[in-house]
Amino acid sequence: GDVGLAGKYAKKLCAKKGLAYHGLMGIRMPENYIAMYQAPCKEEAREIIRRAKEPIQHACSLIGGKKEFPEQESTLANVLKSGMVNDLFYPLFVTAKGYHTTSACIGCGKCAALCPLNNIRMEGKQPVWGNECTQCMACICGCPAKAVEYRKKTHGKERYYLEG
């Protein structure tokens, strides 16, 4: 993918949070949105990450030097894609409804721990999803038992989660 209009949204978010916006940089990483796409196999994911190291180091040097990131060109394609995704797709389709565990769930709670929105709570040894999901796929792709699924869209699919 590309950054689309992420700069526009990041700039608004920074202003809302009282932070200075210094730009953004798109860095290709392995796909993990397995509700719609296919994640790469482990070997391909490693290669994608290997290729990402140089742009990450460049971003770090810009940050370390307190320099702005280069301005990202906003194309009509970016406007259409990002506009459609953020204005139509997100409100209509991005929901926690449909997340569930299979009998393979070991009740470890890792899904709840990985959720950046704290949208998953454990009731006994079972995860329960709230309503604040952004579909980051961390709960699905980070599950050690591969027991978290989203509707029927993720069954049997390769999972990718970058461990820290």
Where are these regions (language model features)?
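FMN-binding flavodoxin-like domain, especially the glycine-rich phosphate-binding loop
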Residues: 1-88
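Residue-level preference for nonpolar/small residues embedded in alpha-helices
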Residues: 5-6, 97, 107, 135
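Generic structural signal for residues in well-ordered beta-strands
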Residues: 21-24, 99, 127
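Aromatic-enriched hydrophobic runs in primary sequence
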Residues: 31-34, 69, 88-90, 110, ...
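A mid-sequence, solvent-exposed acidic-amphipathic segment
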Residues: 75-107, 113
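Iron-sulfur cluster-binding cysteine motifs and their immediate structural context
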Residues: 101, 110-128, 134, 138-155
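Active-site-proximal loop/hinge segments that shape catalytic or ion-binding/gating pockets
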Residues: 160-163
